[in-house]
Amino acid sequence: GAPSRGNAHILPSGRNFFSLDPQTMPTPTGWREGVELADQLLRGYAEAHPDQPWPRTVGVVVWGTPNMRSGGADIAEILYLMGVRPVWESSGLVSGLQIIEPCELGRPRIDVSPRISSLFRDAFPNLVEMVDRAVRMVAALPEPDDDNMLRAHVEADVAEMTARGIDVEQARRRATLRVFGCPPGGYGAGVEELIETKAWQDKADLGRAYIAASSHAYGEGVLGQVETERFTASLKRMDVTVKNEDTREYDMLSCTDFYNYYGGLIAAATTVRGEAPMSLVGDSSDPTRIATRTTTEEARLILRSRILNPSWIEGLQRHGYKGAGDLSAVLDILIGWDATADVVDDGLWERVARRYALDPAMQEWFRQVNPHALHNIVDKLLDAAQRHVWEANPSTVEELENTYADIEGTIEEVSDDPAIAPNTRVGAPPQNPAGGLDLSELGLI
């Protein structure tokens, strides 16, 4: 658990050497959180789409450590959307699954497709199989299509595959595949590399990279087989995407993994559908006050409360070279999010440019502690403008171009000065001037 989620009793750390028993997930607490998250998602979608009040398919990004802290709230949400609940033994272990009857559920069963992280794949194979089992249970129910969207999709896909000559049993198994991720032993989502190397032209490039990295299916007897057709079919019906945040210790603008996994899913769905799905963030950082916001609202909240907060910036400035790198990493993350999901409006881009790159005092500080960080900030801002991710004012672009030329001169002067270069960390490009974190490679998601 996390101390910030009402679990102060876990402190001091170092006494407990396991997080939780995977066989107890989702826990009763996690179930209650998941049900509330699902209800809020459905209410939000219905309010935004009165002509089509129920989404056909919900795409859920599922990470490992958040589910350890929340007791499997993501899995609970997935099960509840499908109209299935866990059955617990008196010991707290989950012993099975139970169909929620239509009269109790009070709504259609929603199709759900989780995109799991590699840590989740490796740490919770029992939960992967649980979701897969729930899908097949719901697909087998003799219910009308309007009451059971998952079954309707499965039957349509089986008919399409058998018409192409695929064996009916094989077709049915493939039609019920819903859990997707990286290949066995693989990590990442394919998008971050393109953003960092600028090896992309449009959102479709990012979407295709995500599909290529994420089309490996998992379930009972299915261990990462390539199912691009099945993953694409889920994306085509994906009216809503969601990633839940269980803590405020970090957020969607904290590192590149967030846009890599979740922004990439939005880009992939947009590429296949031809229009963006509704994208949401479930906030259960305070389990007593769960909230759901659109991804754009969440990004705006974080930009205004943290990224543009003078107190936060001043706090990082106290850390000199490393603080400058962390400020620089903000731009790596912003361009990734806006390229994949269009979550940053032009006014906020302008404010970031003015605060981070064009403020004379900030420029002088960067030159003193880490000119490479400022170089990266301006480079990312210009890249965003040139790709029309940010429709920048021409005067702002001109200022950024002048700053870019000026900081390049500063870096050359420092690098060429033998009296400075050997004795300062500013004299040569750092290994990671942006100072960003890759939680996926660290095995933390």
Kindly give the residue locations of the regions a language model identified.
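Ligand/cofactor-recognition surfaces for anionic moieties
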Residues: 1-445
